[in-house]
Amino acid sequence: MQGQSQQQAYDRGITIFSPDGRLYQVEYAREAVKRGTASIGIRTEDGVVLVVDKRIRSPLMERTSVEKIHKADDHIGIASAGHVADARQLIDFARRQAQVNQLRYDEPIGVETLTKAVTDHIQQYTQVGGARPFGVALIIGGIEDGEPRLYETDPSGTPYEWQALAVGADRGDIQEYLEEHYSESLDTEAGIGLALEALASVNDDSLTPEGIGLATVTVDDDDGFSQLSDEEIEAHLEERDLLEAEDDADEDDEE
């Protein structure tokens, strides 16, 4: 009984380590990330690809209200998984940091610099009483000094750099697919294909353009960050035979 009450005390105390060195509220925040739909980031030779699963819960919901890919700056995109409201707060923070850097130094913020600013902000909420950790993970991808960079933030406030990663639901299965098929020599087109195939691998090998968000940040593109339209996504799905059949889509609607 005493052990159980001690366990509950560590559960409630965001600033208290358990005897085995764990912060339970941070671990619970990571569980919240797993409840969000999947997001994927892939670093290619000439850019970064971001793909997200943004299926809506009801046909009555406006699709444009579901945002999982965000533009932080002309050369940086961010994908999220977990609590949408928490993601929005961090996206706004990242955008402010990018603007401040541009005004202060008259140059675009570095991808690593922005990531560490965001993770420092996240980390503060793991050691302050009266607050809770952010229940969201971000994939931050962009171009820095002509080179693609790809980072992950997690609820503990730790930044990780990746070649390819997934966050959110089915992370383990998607990550396993990426590890098996990723190559450092991928170009952006091949990176888009790999991300879509990885997401399809946990969705019965079929996807709909309405349920997918896709963006790229490329070295050669003057605009840098670019979000693809439904028509462009549909073309990529058709090219790889990943487009969900209309009969299957109708059955899903009936369910």
From Swiss-Prot:
It is found in: Cytoplasm. The keyword Cytoplasm applies. Its main location: cytoplasm. Pfam families: Proteasome, Proteasome_A_N. Gene3D superfamilies: Glutamine Phosphoribosylpyrophosphate, subunit 1, domain 1. It comes from the Archaea. The formation of the proteasomal ATPase PAN-20S proteasome complex, via the docking of the C-termini of PAN into the intersubunit pockets in the alpha-rings, triggers opening of the gate for substrate entry. Interconversion between the open-gate and close-gate conformations leads to a dynamic regulation of the 20S proteasome proteolysis activity. InterPro entries: Ntn_hydrolases_N, Proteasome_alpha, Proteasome_alpha-type, Proteasome_asu_arc, Proteasome_asu_N, Proteasome_sua/b. Keywords: Cytoplasm, Proteasome. One of its GO terms (cellular component) is cytoplasm. SMART domains: Proteasome_A_N. GO terms for biological process: proteasomal protein catabolic process; ubiquitin-dependent protein catabolic process. GO terms for molecular function: threonine-type endopeptidase activity. PANTHER family: PROTEASOME SUBUNIT ALPHA/BETA. Component of the proteasome core, a large protease complex with broad specificity involved in protein degradation. The 20S proteasome core is composed of 14 alpha and 14 beta subunits that assemble into four stacked heptameric rings, resulting in a barrel-shaped structure. The two inner rings, each composed of seven catalytic beta subunits, are sandwiched by two outer rings, each composed of seven alpha subunits. The catalytic chamber with the active sites is on the inside of the barrel. Has a gated structure, the ends of the cylinder being occluded by the N-termini of the alpha-subunits. Is capped at one or both ends by the proteasome regulatory ATPase, PAN. Belongs to the peptidase T1A family. This is Proteasome subunit alpha.
